[in-house]
Regions:
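Rossmann-like dinucleotide-binding cores of NAD(P)H-dependent redox enzymes
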Residues: 47-56, 155-213, 295-300, 318-320, ...
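Beta1-alpha1 glycine-rich phosphate/pyrophosphate-binding loop at the start
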Residues: 2-74, 112, 154, 162-187, ...
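Flexible, glycine-rich terminal cap/loop adjacent to redox cofactors
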Residues: 11-13, 25-30, 38, 240, ...
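Short hydrophobic core segments
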Residues: 11, 98-108, 231-241, 305, ...
């Protein structure tokens, strides 16, 4: 067998693996870094619905390998099949043994396949992340006139909207009472559902898919619901989430967490010496409840990757990864929906005492300007000290960056009192007015609920200091 030695070896070349390698090379310039990736072309995972729907081609959705190679990272197209932590070696499918000083698992996730009759039939698809699978899915469904999509999470909703845009008849089926339930409270979900139905999609909430109907050729011809109703279609797409790809980690003996991810500490270290895990394959801990959660986001993955890469040789990154703040954004029709932190329904389930407020304004000023969108901001604060722990926003394109600002507010444990004094930049064509900036106005509403109209400013400051 051929033998090669690297200081830092990364298994997997998705967003987490790529950022781990690039950051490691930047912070440890004298170290050799290699990424071992099975697929020759890496896709932008979040844009897959727009490839499948025909808005762009898969070749336009590729992450350039130069992002890594220009920084001095070796990119190897191979598959690691065995790891020996004692020998610090990883064996590949192409019969190469890679030695390492530091090893990072970034093996990503795989689509869930529900245990139901007919899932192995022809014309049944899951949404995989490699170029070949994406192209195969797109080719197979392009001639389908009617498609059933099972799952009302982000992938299901976004693919449904893309197919509807191209004129296909779509039935979207979800077992939850609302779409995107992991990220949004009912009022935001209902706003999205209205747009979905106006797009011509037959949305079925609170429905369980019992089995996939097939013909004598073992081709899918529709689904049967738990009510006995049969919905016929030309293809079925299963978009019911993903699970951590940890087969290699399990084989190597790594500890696996409650939600199926590789157990890691706040520096992304596993229980094996000099072995780290990042991204979808790594376990996640909620920033507030500290419970293990099954969240998978590229933005979270890259944050973990930076923490791991900087911490490979010694703990220099003082602000360790302190938990996952769920930050989502999506587009339904011409409206942007975004969420950060805890939802109101989640807070109720976790018995967190909260105060909420919602402000509705516009994303330009005056609101009579062309292309002005209604903008809705909901803030969720802890009752005992006014700390912002969650929020949701809907509106125009500016929502995409507003939610990132809200994520920073949550991560830094800012209170509603501190938000009221926030200094912001505004412009008539770009933002809401300074007199009615939605995040600040929602914070004012929360504060009035918390402290009343006559609460003194010095008392507010005293409480804010305890945050």
């Amino acid at each position: 067998m051929k033998r090669v030695k690297y200081d830092i070896l990364v298994i997997g070349g998705g967003p987490a693996g790529m950022i781990t390698a690039v950051t490691a090379k930047a912070y440890h310039k004298d170290k050799s870094v290699a990424v071992v990736r099975k697929n020759k072309r890496a896709q932008v995972p979040c844009a897959i619905p727009y490839v499948v729907g025909g808005r762009i081609e898969s070749c336009q959705n590729e992450v350039p390998d130069a992002v890594m190679t220009k920084e001095g990272v070796d990119l190897i197209f191979d598959e690691i099949v065995e790891v020996d932590f004692c020998k610090k070696e990883a064996k590949s499918l192409n019969k190469t043994i890679y030695g390492y000083d530091k090893l990072v698992f970034a093996t990503g996730s795989l689509p869930n396949i529900p245990p139901m009759e007919g899932v192995d039939a022809e014309k049944v698809f899951t949404v995989k992340k490699d170029k070949e699978s994406i192209d195969a899915l797109k080719k197979s469904v392009c001639e389908a006139e009617k498609i059933v999509i099972v799952g009302t999470g982000f992938i299901g909703v976004e693919i449904a909207m893309e197919f509807a845009r191209s004129g296909k008849e779509i039935v979207l089926i979800g077992r939850e009472s609302d779409i995107l339930r992991q990220a949004f409270d009912k009022e935001f979900a209902k706003e999205g559902e209205r747009i979905i139905r106006e797009s011509g999609i037959d949305l079925r909430n609170s429905c369980n898919t019992e089995r996939i109907l097939t013909n004598e050729k073992n081709e899918a011809i529709g689904v049967e619901l738990d009510t006995g109703e049969k919905i016929y279609s030309d293809a079925v797409i299963l978009a019911v989430g993903y699970h951590p790809n940890v087969a290699l980690a399990k084989k190597a003996g790594l500890r696996i967490g409650k939600k199926g991810g590789i157990w890691v500490d706040e520096y992304m270290r596993t229980e094996a010496e000099d072995v780290f895990a990042v991204g979808d394959c790594a376990s996640k801990q909620h920033f507030l409840t500290r419970k293990t959660i099954g969240l998978m986001l590229a933005s979270t993955s890259t944050a973990e990757a930076r923490v791991a890469a900087i911490s490979l040789y010694k703990i220099e990154y003082i602000k360790r990864f302190s938990g996952t703040i769920s930050i989502f954004s999506t587009v339904i029709g011409d409206r942007v929906f975004a969420s950060a932190g805890v939802t109101e329904s989640e807070a109720v389930r976790e018995n967190i005492d909260i105060v909420t407020a919602t402000f509705e304004g516009t994303d330009k000023h005056p609101g009579t300007l062309k292309d002005t969108h209604k903008q809705i901001v909901k803030l969720i604060a802890a009752r005992h000290n006014g700390t912002i722990i969650g929020g949701q926003i809907s509106g125009g394109e500016s929502v995409g960056e507003m939610i990132n600002a809200l994520g920073i507010i949550i991560e830094n444990r800012m209170s509603v009192s501190s938000l009221i004094g926030l200094q912001i930049a505004t412009h008539p064509l770009l933002t809401a007015p300074p007199t009615a900036y939605p995040i600040i106005k929602a914070a004012e509403m929360v504060e009035r609920k918390l402290y009343g109209e006559n609460f003194s400013s010095c008392e507010r400051e005293r409480i804010a200091e305890t945050v």
